[in-house]
Amino acid sequence: MAQFFKAKPNSSKQLSAKLSLNVDQLDHLGAGIAQYQGKVVFIPGALPDETVTVQLTEQKKNYARAKLIKVDAQSPERVEPECPHYHTCGGCDLQHMSLSGQREHKEAALLDIMAKFAGTEGGALSPALTGEGWHYRRRARLATLFDKNTKHLSLGFRAASSSNVVPISQCQVLAKPLSDLIVPFAKLLNQLSAKASLGHLELIAADNGHFAVLRITKALNDKDLAKLSAFAEQHQIYICLQDNEGQFQGVGVELVLPVYQLLDENAQSDAVSLSFTPGNFVQVNSQINKAMVAQAMDWLAPAPDERILDLFCGMGNFSLPLAKMGADVIGVEGVAEMVSQARVNAKANNLDKLTFYHGDLSADLSLEPWMGKIDKLLLDPARAGAFESLQWLKKMKPRKVLYVSCNPASLARDSTVLLERGYRLQRLGLIDMFPQTHHIEAMALFELTK
């Protein structure tokens, strides 16, 4: 028998009266933290040492969330955001804080979470890897928004915590040549007869040119292709189309893959070049990626003929430089397409001391052909971390473990596994891969002591 209940009003979502709060610190997502009636209050947009007027938007038993109404007393770290879209676009969330303040916060947050969960309090950080604060991204994916009423197509990014597309005319963290293409591309796409069926637009700046990948849901006619080809020639950019099956087709020219170099770019004999398809993952900050790889080589110190395992190796960002320095490298990656690209890159660089495998690194690894004694281990996992992979340390017994992390929480959790297995944290440093955002990347070096 069906029973019907009248839904209770959700009072937890109602706005409170305006409150004046003092902000103490930032949380790991870049929101200000204040106290109110025994609860922690999270306030996006607020900074430490500020007095702010807010309204509570959500109340739970132990915490609340608030909307920033006004800053009554400013922090000396507060600055005017440079991007006109900052308050609506969901891409950046710390443009209101000075770059030096952002980095101090990220280093403090990294130390705090490692001390809290990995018991590493009292340690000092290695110098942070830092670079340009603006126009550092070599890659971005722009969403399309087609208005059925006006028949107009807009390009933009998603709003924070939303699927809504915010139309933009520029991006202050995207490489300047790519940012300058946003308005011309929007104008071009509105001239296409297929504009209602276009998907996202990906822009890429590589060492061998600028690229645009346009997602299409149906084949374009000859007139649309001619317009794209003319645009590509005018703006000196490679354009390729990606269809529903994920296949890529060059517009006007043969398909060209973007390429970037690592190690010494001035001495070609020491450099390695990596090509990638638009579907492959690459680090978006070219300057910091080069510094990160160089630091990894310095910290791990690969020697000729050492057996080094590179887990979550991608298309060879670390594997190729390790092999270039003489090590016998085994790379393992969970995405088959990236394993294929890693093999292509190894062959293109004439590196034969490299073997790549495709496999699920969260599964039972005991019977994998590459499992066994190694000299050193490099890990570069996704945000979920490498907890499952580290359960097999006893079979691998590396003297050194270099962990490159894009999530301090999973790094701290995984560090406990290493510490329990007899490893000691020797070095820890911030990698500021994403200025103007709360995202924290880090590099940690562990050495076996038992």
Swiss-Prot record:
Q: For binding [4Fe-4S] cluster, which residues are annotated in this chain's numbering?
A: C83, C89, C92, C171
Superkingdom of origin organism: Bacteria
Supply one GO BP term. rRNA base methylation
State the Pfam families in the record: TRAM, tRNA_U5-meth_tr
**Gene Ontology molecular function, alphabetical:** 4 iron, 4 sulfur cluster binding; iron ion binding; RNA binding; rRNA (uridine-C5-)-methyltransferase activity
Binding-site positions, S-adenosyl-L-methionine: Q283, F312, N317, E333, D360, D380
Sorted alphabetically, which Gene3D superfamilies does this protein's record hold? 2.40.50.1070, Nucleic acid-binding proteins, Vaccinia Virus protein VP39
The EC number of this protein is 2.1.1.190
Keywords from the UniProt entry? 4Fe-4S, Iron, Iron-sulfur, Metal-binding, Methyltransferase, rRNA processing, S-adenosyl-L-methionine, Transferase
TRAM domain boundaries: 12-70
Q: Which InterPro entries match?
A: 23S_rRNA_MeTrfase_RlmD, MeTrfase_TrmA_AS, MeTrfase_TrmA_CS, NA-bd_OB-fold, SAM-dependent_MTases_sf, TRAM_dom, U5_MeTrfase_fam
Active-site residues (renumbered): C406 (nucleophile)
Q: Which reaction does it catalyse?
A: uridine(1939) in 23S rRNA + S-adenosyl-L-methionine = 5-methyluridine(1939) in 23S rRNA + S-adenosyl-L-homocysteine + H(+)
Q: Which family does it belong to?
A: Belongs to the class I-like SAM-binding methyltransferase superfamily. RNA M5U methyltransferase family. RlmD subfamily.
Q: What does this protein do?
A: Catalyzes the formation of 5-methyl-uridine at position 1939 (m5U1939) in 23S rRNA.
Q: Which HAMAP family match?
A: 23SrRNA_methyltr_RlmD
Q: What is this protein called?
A: 23S rRNA (uracil(1939)-C(5))-methyltransferase RlmD
Native organism: Shewanella putrefaciens (strain CN-32 / ATCC BAA-453)
